[in-house]
């Protein structure tokens, strides 16, 4: 099992990060990708990856919520971070028109800039899209021939959106959203449509604690050690063997990020 989406820089992990990693190892997680969401957190993510070398890797990027912070200095910082072999993707980048913490045009500018950087550095992209699919694909598509690989993290969209992403060759990240019988019902029906070699799994910890976990942790905080629960649910929905799915998705992650 490999967790492709861990927000280990979150203050929710401030008091016990090492224990979180230890619990992940004990749960059978073979590695994890620490997400960078702005310049500072991308630096912190790389620092954490260095502390857990050969087990953790990181991304360097600016989440659409932080797109208004984009500057020439930001680009220079990401470029410098990406010199480390532990930085294996540019992102989390993309569009989020759900709440528009940054204006749409700021998001578009930062997204294009990061796609250009990923193409230049021959790195995969770790993508985010929420309520912006048409614009997202329109921007992304011309870059795809120049990109090493692309994964749309935490996919929660509709069938047409999944089919569109698959048609463009994207890999798909699935989280504990699949474990929510209310919000995740459509996703539960779609997950069998994802080709086995393009499926990746993630917790998005500390967010998205699987709703059907029993017992629930008192903190209600998600952790990478809960990834086996997501693997079990995805395997059940796809009719896959749990161990085979765990191995296949870990292989997919290592192949996509060049580990």
Curated annotation (Swiss-Prot):
| Principal localisation | cytoplasm
What this protein needs as a cofactor is:
Mg(2+)
Keyword field: Cytoplasm, Exonuclease, Hydrolase, Magnesium, Metal-binding, Nuclease
UniProt EC number: 3.1.11.-, 3.1.13.-
- The enzyme's main class, written as a single word, is hydrolase
- Which terms in the Gene Ontology molecular function aspect does this entry carry? 3'-5'-RNA exonuclease activity; magnesium ion binding; single-stranded DNA 3'-5' DNA exonuclease activity
Q: What's one Pfam family the UniProt record gives for this protein? A: TatD_DNase
Fill in the subunit field for this protein. Monomer.
Q: Which PANTHER family does the record match to this protein?
A: DEOXYRIBONUCLEASE TATDN1, TATD FAMILY DEOXYRIBONUCLEASE
Q: What is this protein called?
A: 3'-5' ssDNA/RNA exonuclease TatD
Question: From which lineage does this chain's organism come?
Answer: Bacteria, Pseudomonadati, Pseudomonadota, Gammaproteobacteria, Enterobacterales
Give the encoding gene's name: tatD
């Amino acid at each position: 099992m490999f967790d492709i989406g861990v927000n280990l820089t979150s203050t929710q992990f401030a008091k016990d990060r090492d224990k979180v990693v230890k619990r992940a190892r004990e749960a059978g997680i073979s590695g994890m990708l620490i997400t960078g969401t702005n310049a500072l957190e991308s630096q912190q993510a790389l620092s954490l990856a260095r502390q857990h070398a050969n087990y953790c890797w990181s991304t360097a990027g600016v989440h659409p919520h932080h797109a208004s912070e984009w500057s020439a200095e930001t680009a220079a910082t990401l470029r410098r971070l990406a010199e480390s072999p532990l930085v294996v993707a540019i992102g989390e980048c993309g569009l989020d028109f759900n709440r528009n913490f940054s204006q749409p045009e700021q998001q578009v500018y930062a997204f294009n800039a990061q796609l250009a950087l990923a193409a230049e550095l021959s790195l995969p992209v770790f993508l985010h899209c929420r309520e912006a699919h048409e614009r997202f694909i329109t921007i992304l598509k011309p870059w795809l021939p120049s990109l090493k690989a692309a994964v749309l993290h935490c996919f929660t969209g509709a069938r047409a959106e999944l089919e569109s992403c698959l048609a463009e060759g994207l890999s798909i990240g699935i989280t504990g959203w699949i474990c929510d019988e209310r919000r995740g019902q459509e996703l539960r029906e779609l997950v069998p449509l994802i080709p086995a070699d393009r499926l990746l799994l993630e917790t998005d910890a500390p967010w998205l604690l699987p709703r059907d976990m029993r017992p629930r942790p008192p903190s209600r905080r998600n952790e990478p050690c809960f990834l086996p629960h997501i693997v079990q649910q995805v395997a059940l929905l796809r009719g896959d063997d749990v161990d085979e799915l765990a191995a296949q998705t870990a292989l997919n992650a290592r192949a996509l990020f060049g580990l």
